[in-house]
């Protein structure tokens, strides 16, 4: 059995120029052309050239990171055709990439879902000023106290040492003050709103109608679910339900990685722009190997 786990980047990793060198391969170029056709705008141009402001819009950013991550994965497969994976995971929108790679839904369908998901999340952010704050080194009890005092929520449990909280702008401001009083390091993030919290319920409700018409299949590769930190079931409807919950519930990334390691994962290969996940994974367990495929140079540097 393979000891390799493929992991896929989430929102925030985007940067102009991403995927451009992969697109020198005609097969990857065709992937971007297909995305352009499905979405009805020039996604490739925005990925390759920017502007960065366009790339930060959730309805563009989410399908862009997905397409670039799939391109990186296909380029890897072409170079290492004999390499197999024992499971897949992705951070937030990256979980959709993992489900596509596992055969749960097609490329075109995933693009359409992510464009809508991004648009709905952006609309929810515009309707209510909200934000996120990254908290480092707090205990579970301290995090509970911060959330209670500020009326905010745990959004991303990235490692035992780093948790991102989501809530109203006022709540985030209160949390920042509480952290200062407690002597806990905290950084307010430059994001559009309170992702992975109940404040995203309007987006989740709109996504229900979109997913109703999308056919899901049982995964051909085990995929870890952000909301549970455990593997998705083989029931397509159950996967759909979990992915709807993901919009408003905590991302239990640390639990996902611990489950992957318990399941035999020793080498984590990150696909997509940047190497944020590799850093998070190393914080969870220093003994594992992390590799990232973000451009042709990083792919060429891999020795397996």
Where are these regions (language model features)?
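Glycine-rich phosphate/pyrophosphate-binding beta-alpha loops
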Residues: 61-63, 194-195, 250
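Charged catalytic carboxylate motif
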Residues: 27, 68, 171, 206, ...
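FabD-like malonyl-/acyl-CoA
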Residues: 2-142, 189, 267-297
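Alpha/beta catalytic cores of group-transfer enzymes, especially the acyltransferase/condensing modules
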Residues: 11-13, 41, 102-241, 245-246
């Amino acid at each position: 059995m393979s000891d390799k786990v493929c992991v896929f980047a989430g929102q925030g990793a985007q940067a102009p120029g991403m995927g451009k060198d992969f697109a020198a391969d005609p097969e990857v170029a065709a992937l971007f052309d297909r995305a352009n056709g499905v979405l009805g705008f020039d996604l490739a141009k925005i990925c390759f050239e920017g502007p960065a402001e366009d790339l930060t819009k959730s309805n563009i950013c989410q399908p862009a990171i997905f397409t670039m991550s799939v391109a990186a994965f296909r380029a890897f497969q072409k170079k290492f055709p004999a390499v197999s994976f024992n499971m897949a995971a992705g951070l937030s929108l990256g979980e959709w990439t993992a489900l596509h790679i596992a055969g749960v839904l097609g490329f075109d369908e995933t693009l359409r879902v992510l464009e809508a998901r991004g648009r709905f999340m952006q609309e929810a952010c515009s309707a209510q000023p909200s934000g996120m704050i990254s908290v480092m080194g707090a205990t579970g009890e301290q995090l509970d106290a911060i959330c209670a005092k500020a009326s905010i929520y745990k959004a991303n449990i990235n490692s035992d040492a780093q948790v991102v909280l989501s809530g109203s702008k006022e709540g985030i401001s209160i949390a920042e003050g509480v952290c200062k009083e407690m002597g806990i390091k905290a950084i307010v993030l430059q994001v559009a709103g309170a992702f992975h919290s109940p404040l995203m319920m309007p987006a989740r409700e709109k996504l229900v109608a979109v997913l109703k018409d999308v056919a899901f299949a049982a995964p051909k590769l085990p995929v870890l679910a952000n909301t549970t930190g455990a593997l998705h079931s083989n029931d397509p409807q159950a996967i759909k339900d979990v992915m709807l919950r993901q919009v408003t519930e905590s991302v239990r990334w640390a639990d996902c990685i611990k489950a992957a390691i318990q399941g035999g994962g020793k080498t984590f290969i990150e696909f997509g722009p940047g190497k944020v996940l590799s850093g998070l994974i190393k914080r969870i367990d220093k003994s594992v190997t992390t590799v990232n495929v973000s451009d042709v140079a990083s792919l060429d540097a891999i020795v397996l």
